């Protein structure tokens, strides 16, 4: 009983403590839970998103999709300063200085301090007299000719070499001897244009026309036997200005036209300049100098040497170069054991006074006297075929044989 009273007392205290009627709360609590459970809707599963069809990647080279957005300008990267940048800048400066100095061509003083402008004001005097056989005609003086004051002074010019090789001069001459040629060999010099230029391309057509007219007057005055044009270019210009004929397929040698109002023949030969590409060497041009000499002798009535036969001359630059390589023979080195192996067959002949002694120092004679073979006399026990001199009959068997024969005849 006491326990029940105690429990009821505690319940009454609890009800008195809460302002809200406790019994009403306890009675409505389960109903509220049910209402809450009924108001909560059941969770509906979310629909699955529709899957897009997977597109197969195209075969071949992959390309980036084009973007319609404008590209932003890329700012230039600023060079990163480092310790090496200072060194590279210095090296570039040094390299520029070196290359600048090497680019400047070294000027060669060809005229011993004389300027080119001063040489252009100079002219080269003609070397002409009456009764000349040949007059050599050039285009115009060059710088070296104007500086030297002589004709064809260039070290590479082939004129003076060809003059000697063809027989037109008896000795080898040079540009310093040009003034002696009229008296000794009947050869004179002149030019089509008097003005000095570095090259013939610096001349105008008006100068060529005027020069051709003056040249005809000179040739009509002195009337040499042959007017020799040193190069095709000179005669082509001369023929066009004087004869009014433009020559096609011009060939070297004697030409059909003569100088107007004279008996002077026109002869064309290759340019004596070393820059002549068709005939780069002096020996390639000598043929036309030889033909010039024959023409001069024919006009002067000099009989031709019948011992010399004329052959047809043809020249091919490529074949000439190939033949030059084939003809080049290297010298054999001296072999000290060569003569010993042949028993001194090619050594000095003891009969120095004899014009020809084919005996091999008495080797064959001694072998024949002893009845031995020639092969047993080979030194050092080396076997070698018999020398070709052994098969030639000896004209003098020994140095004293001729003296003995003379004594016996006496």
From Swiss-Prot:
Ranges of biased composition (kind: Basic and acidic residues): 66-97
Gene3D superfamilies reported for this sequence: Uracil-DNA glycosylase-like domain
Result when mutating residue 197 to A: Reduced DNA glycosylase activity on G/T mispairs
Effect of residue 145 to G: Increased DNA glycosylase activity on G/T mispairs
Cross-link (Glycyl lysine isopeptide (Lys-Gly) (interchain with G-Cter in SUMO)): 330
Alphabetical list of InterPro entries matching this protein: MUG/TDG, TDG-like_euk, Uracil-DNA_glycosylase-like, Uracil-DNA_glycosylase-like_sf
Subcellular location as annotated: Nucleus
Described function: DNA glycosylase that plays a key role in active DNA demethylation: specifically recognizes and binds 5-formylcytosine (5fC) and 5-carboxylcytosine (5caC) in the context of CpG sites and mediates their excision through base-excision repair (BER) to install an unmethylated cytosine. Cannot remove 5-hydroxymethylcytosine (5hmC). According to an alternative model, involved in DNA demethylation by mediating DNA glycolase activity toward 5-hydroxymethyluracil (5hmU) produced by deamination of 5hmC.
MF terms in GO: ATP binding; chloride ion binding; damaged DNA binding; DNA binding; DNA N-glycosylase activity; DNA-binding transcription factor binding; double-stranded DNA binding; G/T mismatch-specific thymine-DNA glycosylase activity
Region spans: Disordered: 37-97
Family: Belongs to the uracil-DNA glycosylase (UDG) superfamily. TDG/mug family.
Cross-link Glycyl lysine isopeptide (Lys-Gly) (interchain with G-Cter in SUMO2) mapped to chain: 103, 248, 330
CDD domains assigned: UDG-F2_TDG_MUG
The record's account of how the chain is modified after translation: Sumoylation on Lys-330 by either SUMO1 or SUMO2 induces dissociation of the product DNA.
GO-annotated biological processes: base-excision repair; base-excision repair, AP site formation; chromosomal 5-methylcytosine DNA demethylation, oxidation pathway; depyrimidination; epigenetic regulation of gene expression; negative regulation of transcription by RNA polymerase II; regulation of embryonic development
Assembly and oligomerization: Homodimer. Interacts with AICDA and GADD45A.
Keywords, alphabetical: Activator, Chromatin regulator, DNA damage, DNA repair, Hydrolase, Isopeptide bond, Nucleus, Transcription, Transcription regulation, Ubl conjugation
Annotated Gene Ontology cellular component terms: nucleoplasm; nucleus; plasma membrane; PML body
EC nos: 3.2.2.29
Name of the protein in its database record: G/T mismatch-specific thymine DNA glycosylase
Reaction equations catalysed: Hydrolyzes mismatched double-stranded DNA and polynucleotides, releasing free thymine
């Amino acid at each position: 009983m006491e326990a029940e009273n105690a429990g009821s007392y505690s319940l009454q205290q609890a009800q008195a403590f809460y302002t809200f009627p406790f019994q009403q709360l306890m009675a409505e609590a389960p109903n509220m839970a049910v209402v809450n459970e009924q108001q909560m809707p059941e969770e509906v599963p979310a629909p699955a998103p529709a899957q897009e069809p997977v597109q197969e990647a195209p075969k071949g080279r992959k390309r980036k999709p084009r973007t319609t957005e404008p590209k932003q300008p890329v700012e230039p990267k600023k060079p990163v300063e480092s310790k090496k940048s200072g060194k590279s800048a210095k090296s570039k400066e040094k390299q520029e200085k070196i290359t600048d100095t090497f680019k400047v061509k070294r000027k060669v003083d060809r005229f011993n301090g004389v300027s080119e402008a001063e040489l252009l004001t100079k002219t080269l005097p003609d070397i002409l007299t009456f009764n000349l056989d040949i007059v050599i005609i050039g285009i115009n003086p060059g710088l070296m000719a104007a500086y030297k004051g002589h004709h064809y002074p260039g070290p590479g010019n082939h004129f003076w070499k060809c003059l000697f090789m063809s027989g037109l001069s008896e000795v080898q001459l040079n540009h310093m001897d040009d003034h002696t040629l009229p008296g000794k060999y009947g050869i004179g010099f002149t030019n089509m244009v008097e003005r000095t230029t570095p090259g013939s391309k610096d001349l105008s057509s008006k100068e060529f026309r005027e020069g051709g007219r003056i040249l005809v007057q000179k040739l009509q005055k002195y009337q040499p036997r042959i007017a020799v044009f040193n190069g095709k270019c000179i005669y082509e210009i001369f023929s066009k200005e004087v004869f009014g004929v433009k020559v096609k397929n011009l060939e070297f040698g004697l030409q059909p036209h003569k100088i107007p109002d004279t008996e002077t023949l026109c002869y064309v030969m290759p340019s004596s300049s070393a820059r002549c590409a068709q005939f780069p060497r002096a020996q390639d041009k000598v043929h036309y100098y030889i033909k010039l000499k024959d023409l001069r002798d024919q006009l002067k009535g000099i009989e031709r040497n019948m011992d010399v036969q004329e052959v047809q001359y043809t020249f091919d630059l490529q074949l000439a170069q190939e033949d030059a390589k084939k003809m080049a023979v290297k010298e054999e080195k001296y072999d000290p054991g060569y003569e010993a192996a042949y028993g001194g067959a090619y050594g000095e002949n003891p009969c120095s006074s004899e014009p020809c002694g084919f005996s091999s120092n008495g080797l064959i004679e001694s072998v024949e006297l002893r009845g031995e073979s020639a092969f047993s006399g080979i030194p050092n026990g080396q076997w070698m075929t018999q020398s070709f001199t052994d098969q030639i009959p000896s004209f003098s068997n020994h140095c004293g044989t001729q003296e003995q024969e003379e004594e016996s005849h006496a």
